[in-house]
């Protein structure tokens, strides 16, 4: 029986495609700007918003998005001050979100069937509303990067130089922190809080092995992320294992394979160079 005839699998493929575009664009900024630890902190802090949403009856994704954005702003503001180190600010909001989420979940009466999907992801349960959220956020992100690619790229590579060029570095950083937080929350249905940061870093790390060009990294990350999702989805269906974890496992295997290929290429290049020098 053809698996593509199932609506839930079609939704999963579309969700994976939109997420690949979104994470490919935002993840390239994260890796280039070296914000992986901050993004990990925002990812886990978003659990506080999920807990508040479940406890109050508000949409957990909406609550998580608000909480994640505020956490990102908090980290950005505190780390800009000289009296608080960036890693300390990240750790504080990371643990704050997790503690608030745990307390709210325990205070919520009854069983919470959606909680595991937020923690570990459940891409096969993606619905129309999730696709609309991913689609709208993807369009917004593409529009922002199309209009402001050069200043964003300048801040990503060297914020000090960007500031010397009179670019609005603080505004760009807060804008990107907003998009990072929204992307993380929008990706929770894919792989969950535990693994969400992987979608924003591993395809970009793989792409970075072969190119340092910012635009090329974005496009390569999107393609690699999409391939990882397709292989991971199919493998999870065949093996009957969680799809989110399988997608991340595939992406790591692709990175390790690419790293090996790159190392062999460098070794052969050095060998050829030495042989030419001897001649």
PLM feature segments, named:
Residues 15-24, 45, 49, 53, ...:
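Alpha-helical transmembrane segments in multi-pass membrane proteins
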Residues 241-248, 252-279:
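Cytosolic-side transmembrane-helix boundaries in multi-pass membrane proteins
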Residues 1-21:
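Membrane-interfacial amphipathic/re-entrant helices at transmembrane-helix boundaries
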Residues 28-111, 207-219, 236-239, 263-264:
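Short loop segments and helix-boundary regions at transmembrane helix junctions
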Residues 130-202:
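Helix-loop-helix "hairpin" substructures at the membrane interface of multi-pass membrane proteins
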Residues 13-18, 61-66, 91-92, 131-136, ...:
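Hydrophobic alpha-helical transmembrane segments
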């Amino acid at each position: 029986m053809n698996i593509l005839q199932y609506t839930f699998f079609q939704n999963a493929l579309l969700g994976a495609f939109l997420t690949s575009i979104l994470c490919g664009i935002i993840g390239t900024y994260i890796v280039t700007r070296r914000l992986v630890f901050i993004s990990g902190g925002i990812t886990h802090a978003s659990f506080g918003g999920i807990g508040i949403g479940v406890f109050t009856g508000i949409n957990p994704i909406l609550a998580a998005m608000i909480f994640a954005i505020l956490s990102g702003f908090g980290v950005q503001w505190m780390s800009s001050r000289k009296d608080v180190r960036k890693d300390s600010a990240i750790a504080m909001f990371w643990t704050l979100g997790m503690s608030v989420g745990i307390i709210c979940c325990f205070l919520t009466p009854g069983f919470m069937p959606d909680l595991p999907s937020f923690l570990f992801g459940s891409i096969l349960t993606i619905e129309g509303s999730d696709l609309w959220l991913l689609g709208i956020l993807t369009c917004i992100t593409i529009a922002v990067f199309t209009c402001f690619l050069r200043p964003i790229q300048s801040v990503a590579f060297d914020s000090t130089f960007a500031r010397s060029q009179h670019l609005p570095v603080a505004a760009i950083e807060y804008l990107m922190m907003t998009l990072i937080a929204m992307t993380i929350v929008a990706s929770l249905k894919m792989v969950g809080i535990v693994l969400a940061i992987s979608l924003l870093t591993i395809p970009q790390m793989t792409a970075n092995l072969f190119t340092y060009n910012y635009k090329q990294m974005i496009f390569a990350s999107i393609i690699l992320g999409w391939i990882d999702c397709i292989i991971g989805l199919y493998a999870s269906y065949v093996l009957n294992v969680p799809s989110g974890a399988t997608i991340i496992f595939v992406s790591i295997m692709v990175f390790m394979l690419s790293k090996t290929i790159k190392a062999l290429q460098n070794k052969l290049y050095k060998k050829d160079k030495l042989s030419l020098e001897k001649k």
